[in-house]
A protein has these predicted regions:
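Outer-membrane beta-barrel and related beta-rich outer-membrane complex signature
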Residues: 115-117, 279-284, 443-451
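Extracellular loop and loop/strand-boundary signature of outer-membrane beta-barrel proteins
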Residues: 73-74, 237-241, 405-407
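Elongated, acidic membrane-bridging lipid-handling scaffolds
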Residues: 125-232, 296-388, 393-398, 477, ...
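Extended terminal
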Residues: 1-12, 256, 262, 306-313, ...
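A short, amphipathic edge element
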Residues: 43-51, 415
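Flexible beta-edge/linker motif
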Residues: 52-118, 132-157, 181-183, 188-190, ...
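N-terminal type II signal-anchor transmembrane helix
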Residues: 1-43, 169, 513, 521-523
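Gram-negative outer-membrane beta-barrel proteins
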Residues: 111-113, 155, 229-231, 275-279, ...
């Protein structure tokens, strides 16, 4: 009798298992269609496709295969492709009478291109109103207490045939996503993320999140970057007239991103080995001007903006080179600083955070010892900064293209120095610029043998004037231009005012008007 009871029990369990498995098989396709339909009902501008669904009733789990998310306006390639996503009941929570699940997302691939970004920017429906959270909640009937993403890869393609930007080996772990053990208004979900940036750099993030905050996810975390190669962003930089070659970025900081508060606190960052040039050309002059307006507007919007704090404790640029290429001039020329060292402390967009201090050293045109010290305060009623700078003993032969473009002459030898102090506040500027030319020889028969007769005569006259102006004991040509007045545009950004002051100083004081001196040379 006892043996018959066991046979019946085993048979019942086997039969129930068979029915359950068969039920799972027959339910798979209708359930797949239901999940796909529920997701797409809430989404705007995007479509989700689920290739296959497997329900495992005995394990209280479900698996989704070949999941894709496409942008309706640009469906190829898919923005997201997930080979496998599985969700299973967390048994430990079930013993406490709570139904929660673990979700595992394996090897997801995220592809973003410039065309898709432009479409998103042009769309009338903002990203936060696309319905992502509603879609996820609609197909997640139980609470998700553990989410793991393993071996994810993010690829950004700017324009063919430029090399794509990749963030690989991304692993994410988040817990307590449905506020199971938390109070409202906190960041209930511990969050960790690691990844590899552009093949050799490292990214990490450690903090907390509220995945169901509206209208977007809220995050508060520490994050860091190590040895991220900057050369990979060359395609993006080129659209802004920037040539970027080499350099690495390392840094650490904290972020807080919530519907009511945005904080980006960079505690320390170092850029090493940067090579960067900005190109100005006649063809892009109007675009550059419009871009400058946009930068100015953005600076005004974030300056002392409530709910937004941008802060950098310490930023350094070391062993780098920066240049400016003027292709609008004839001939073209390049101004540059080698051996560049930049140190910024206490940058912020809020007056309450104090004054930013900057120090810059380098070699102007590869030879002129350069030292710049500056203090900047966040803008309220216009730019507010003070700057003191010196460039000493620049080999003037390296400046010949510049001299030809703006003075119609060049030099065979000579040394250039300049000293300046400027103060800008309340729409007014005060200061001086003092250029110094030493041992300058403008005309050289061997160097200038290919030039026409009139150019040779002109350069000979310029050379004669420079000799008349020389302080004989030290063989120096010195002038000083005092600067005082009001800014043409008091609402211009600090950087725009600074660039304009440098341009005016260079072309009105440093190139001191040789033609004027020819008309009335001083002895």
């Amino acid at each position: 009798m006892r043996r018959t009871w066991w046979i019946w029990l085993i048979g019942a369990v086997a039969g129930l298992s068979t029915i359950t498995i068969a039920l799972g098989v027959f339910v798979d396709e209708p359930l797949r269609r239901y999940v796909e339909r529920q997701l797409n009902t809430h989404l705007k501008g995007y479509t989700v496709r689920v290739g296959k669904l497997d329900l495992h009733p005995l394990r209280f789990s479900v698996e989704l295969f070949d999941v894709a998310i496409v942008q309706d306006a640009n469906p190829d390639p898919a923005i997201v492709h997930v080979p496998r996503l599985s969700s299973s009941v967390q048994w430990r929570a079930l013993l406490s009478a709570r139904v929660v699940s673990d979700v595992l997302v394996e090897r997801p691939q995220i592809h973003i291109n410039l065309k898709q970004i432009r479409q998103e920017a042009a769309d009338d429906v903002p990203l936060k109103d696309r319905g992502w959270q509603e879609a996820v909640q609609a197909v997640t009937p139980v609470k998700v207490n553990l989410l793991q993403v393993v071996e994810a890869e993010v690829t950004y393609i700017d324009q063919e045939p430029l090399e794509p930007l990749r963030l690989g080996q991304v692993n994410l772990r988040a817990e307590n996503i449905r506020n199971i053990r938390s109070e409202v208004g906190e960041f209930p979900s511990p969050l960790q993320l690691q990844g590899v940036v552009f093949g050799t750099g490292n990214l990490w993030l450690d903090g907390h999140a509220d995945f169901l905050a509206t209208p977007h996810v809220a995050v508060k975390a520490q994050l860091g970057l190590e040895n991220v190669p900057l050369g990979y962003v060359k395609p993006i930089a080129s659209r802004y007239n920037i040539i970027l070659k080499g350099g690495t970025l390392s840094g650490a900081g904290a972020i807080e991103y919530t519907p009511s508060r945005k904080v980006a606190h960079l505690q320390q960052a170092t850029v090493h080995g940067l090579r960067i040039d900005y190109i100005h050309s006649a063809q892009t002059a109007e675009v550059e001007q419009e871009r400058g307006k946009q930068v100015r507007q953005a600076a005004q919007q974030v300056s002392n903006a409530p709910g937004l704090l941008l802060r950098a404790d310490e930023v350094s640029i070391v062993k780098s080179q920066i240049g400016f290429i003027n292709e609008a001039a004839k001939p073209h020329y390049r101004l540059f600083l080698t051996d560049l060292e930049v140190h910024l402390t206490n940058f912020s967009n809020h007056l309450s955070e104090g004054t930013m201090v900057a120090k810059v050293t380098g070699k102007f045109m590869g030879s002129g010892q350069t030292l710049v010290g500056a203090t900047f305060r966040p803008e309220t009623d216009g730019p507010d900064f003070a700057i003191a700078a010196s460039i000493e003993n620049t080999d003037m032969q390296a400046m010949n293209q510049l001299l030809r473009a703006h003075g119609n002459f060049d030099v065979a030898r000579g040394f250039f120095s300049v000293y300046t102090e400027l103060r800008v506040k309340n729409g007014a500027v005060r200061g001086y610029v003092k250029p110094l030319f030493k041992e300058m020889d403008v005309y050289d028969a061997h160097q200038d043998r290919e030039k026409n007769l009139f150019q040779k005569i002109y350069e000979g006259l310029v050379g004669g004037v420079s000799q008349l102006l020389e302080n004989r004991p030290r063989e120096e040509v010195a002038t000083k231009a005092n600067i005082a007045g009001h800014l043409e545009n008091p609402q211009a950004s600090t950087w725009q005012v600074l660039v304009n002051l440098i341009q005016n100083a260079f072309f009105q004081a440093i190139l001191p008007g040789f033609e004027r001196e020819l008309r009335g040379p001083r002895r």
